[in-house]
Swiss-Prot record:
<comment type="pathway">
    <text>Amino-acid biosynthesis; L-tryptophan biosynthesis; L-tryptophan from chorismate: step 5/5.</text>
</comment>
<dbReference type="InterPro" id="IPR011060">
    <property type="entry name" value="RibuloseP-bd_barrel"/>
</dbReference>
<comment type="similarity">
    <text>Belongs to the TrpA family.</text>
</comment>
<dbReference type="InterPro" id="IPR002028">
    <property type="entry name" value="Trp_synthase_suA"/>
</dbReference>
<dbReference type="InterPro" id="IPR018204">
    <property type="entry name" value="Trp_synthase_alpha_AS"/>
</dbReference>
<dbReference type="GO" id="GO:0005829">
    <property type="term" value="C:cytosol"/>
</dbReference>
<dbReference type="GO" id="GO:0004834">
    <property type="term" value="F:tryptophan synthase activity"/>
</dbReference>
<keyword id="KW-0822">Tryptophan biosynthesis</keyword>
<dbReference type="InterPro" id="IPR013785">
    <property type="entry name" value="Aldolase_TIM"/>
</dbReference>
<comment type="subunit">
    <text>Tetramer of two alpha and two beta chains.</text>
</comment>
<keyword id="KW-0057">Aromatic amino acid biosynthesis</keyword>
<protein>
    <recommendedName>
        <fullName>Tryptophan synthase alpha chain</fullName>
        <ecNumber>4.2.1.20</ecNumber>
    </recommendedName>
</protein>
<dbReference type="Pfam" id="PF00290">
    <property type="entry name" value="Trp_syntA"/>
</dbReference>
<feature type="active site" description="Proton acceptor">
    <location>
        <position position="49"/>
    </location>
</feature>
<feature type="active site" description="Proton acceptor">
    <location>
        <position position="60"/>
    </location>
</feature>
<keyword id="KW-0456">Lyase</keyword>
<comment type="function">
    <text>The alpha subunit is responsible for the aldol cleavage of indoleglycerol phosphate to indole and glyceraldehyde 3-phosphate.</text>
</comment>
Length: 271
């Protein structure tokens, strides 16, 4: 059983929901990411999504775009991101890490080499935003052969056919983008999310995480009531992007702990 599957199985047995924070590797300081990952895990993160910086992150709003730009300005490469995961794994061999990014860095690195090096570093899953499921079955097969979970996005505009494609090849979990548009935008319509999740579940057997638009404990709890996991990215980056170095880790950890406490008020409830 993969680390991601084991994590969701453990949480399901406890009647708890997964908390999945996202940060961009190398932001807001090049050498702070591993400390940030450890602090978030200790504060209650169940899975960590680590963004691979890219110059044209088309699905991301201005907050995550700025994070990518800051990381790239410090010359953070895909190899650097993998090295960060390897360092994290030196002292944490239980918290799953998912790399989230775009096709261009994967293609430049070389897909086969990327999979091999991701596995060696201790990565658990890979989400390539602009790899449509029907066009990347070979890559998904390669990931699974390396015991890595191919993770995919679904959106309010996703058709039943796309959901079926994702359900056929995704492992680990699927990430439902709860808003049309880019990350960090708009107001979350939790009723619309609640209506969509059963439709997704009819096509997908893995857990369903929901992200985009989750900014505080109240929205996290509302989403967690109807899903298996809450994904938070833009809000974390907003909180830390202008902090001095010594405040970045405690600010992020404090926010994660607040969300974790709120989610655990739902313990024993089922989506």
């Amino acid at each position: 059983m993969s680390r991601i599957a084991a994590t969701f199985a453990r949480l399901a047995g406890q009647g708890r929901k997964a908390l999945i924070p996202y940060v961009t590797a190398g932001d807001p300081f090049a050498d702070i990411t591993v400390d940030l990952m450890h602090a978030m895990a200790k504060a209650g993160a169940d899975v960590i999504e680590l963004g691979v910086p890219f110059s044209d992150p088309m699905a991301d709003g201005p907050v995550i775009q700025r994070a990518s730009e800051r990381a790239l300005s410090r010359n953070i490469s895909t190899a650097d991101v993998l090295a960060m995961v390897a360092r994290f794994r030196e002292t944490d061999d239980t918290t799953p890490v998912v790399l989230m990014g775009y096709a261009n860095p994967v293609e430049r690195y070389g897909p086969d080499r990327f999979v091999d090096d991701a596995r060696a570093a201790g990565v658990d899953g890979v989400l390539v935003v602009d790899y449509p499921p029907q066009e990347c079955e070979a890559f998904a097969d390669r990931l699974r052969a390396a015991d890595l979970d191919p993770i995919f996005l679904l959106a309010p505009t996703s058709t039943d056919a796309r959901m079926a494609d994702v359900g056929r090849i995704a492992t680990g979990y699927v990430y439902y983008v709860s808003l049309k548009g880019v990350t960090g935008s708009g107001n979350l319509d939790t009723d619309a999310v609640a209506r969509m999740i059963p439709r997704i579940r009819s096509h997908v057997s893995v857990p369903v995480g929901v992200g985009f638009g989750i900014r505080d404990a109240a929205t996290a709890v509302a989403v967690a009531r109807v899903s298996d996991a809450v994904v938070i990215g833009s809000r974390i980056i907003q909180l830390i992007e202008n902090e001095p170095r010594e405040r970045v880790v405690p600010v992020a950890a404090g926010f994660i702990a607040e969300i974790r406490t709120a989610l655990d008020t739902l313990q024993g409830t089922h989506a």
